[in-house]
């Protein structure tokens, strides 16, 4: 046999922004957004896949701009973050959260672990393959919306490996 491709996988972080998540890095988020956009409810409302991104308007919460938290400035002390008072950490606006795919809102799906997602997306081959590869590498405990900035070097490395393996 011949080597078709060689990939170097390091422990470098996979995202510099909390907007980068396990689901966005692996490409699973694009497919999940398409599933939501294909629902009858989304079609009736005229929502495309972009509506289910917490990175763009419309769709994301206007208060926290899709972050799920807001910065709180404290006098004489370092600032901190607090759960968004409008979306309560959901990252999306109220209208977007009214759309359900198989009984679940988009923010609920982002709260699923890789193990849950593997089961629930079993009928969707690309998603099942993505979450299967992550689970096989011992990452079944991570949630789909887990911020890339909060991953350890080893977790980031295994996510990169899983992403390459499921291509």
Predicted regions and their residues:
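Conserved phosphate-binding elements of NTP-dependent enzyme cores
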Residues: 1-167
């Amino acid at each position: 046999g011949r080597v078709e491709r060689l990939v170097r996988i390091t422990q470098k972080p996979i995202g510099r922004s909390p907007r980068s998540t396990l689901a966005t890095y692996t490409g699973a988020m694009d497919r999940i957004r398409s599933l939501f956009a294909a629902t009858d409810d989304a079609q009736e409302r005229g929502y495309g896949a972009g509506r289910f991104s917490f990175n763009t308007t419309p769709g994301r919460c206007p208060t926290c701009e899709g972050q799920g938290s807001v910065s709180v400035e404290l006098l004489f002390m370092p600032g901190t973050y607090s759960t968004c008072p409008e979306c309560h950490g959901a990252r999306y606006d109220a209208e977007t959260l009214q759309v359900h795919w198989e009984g679940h809102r988009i923010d609920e799906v982002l709260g699923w672990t890789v193990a849950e997602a593997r089961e629930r997306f079993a009928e969707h081959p690309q998603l099942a393959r993505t979450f299967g590869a992550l689970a096989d590498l011992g990452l079944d405990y991570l949630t789909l919306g887990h911020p890339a900035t909060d991953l350890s070097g080893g977790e980031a490395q295994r996510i990169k490996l899983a992403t390459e393996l499921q291509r």
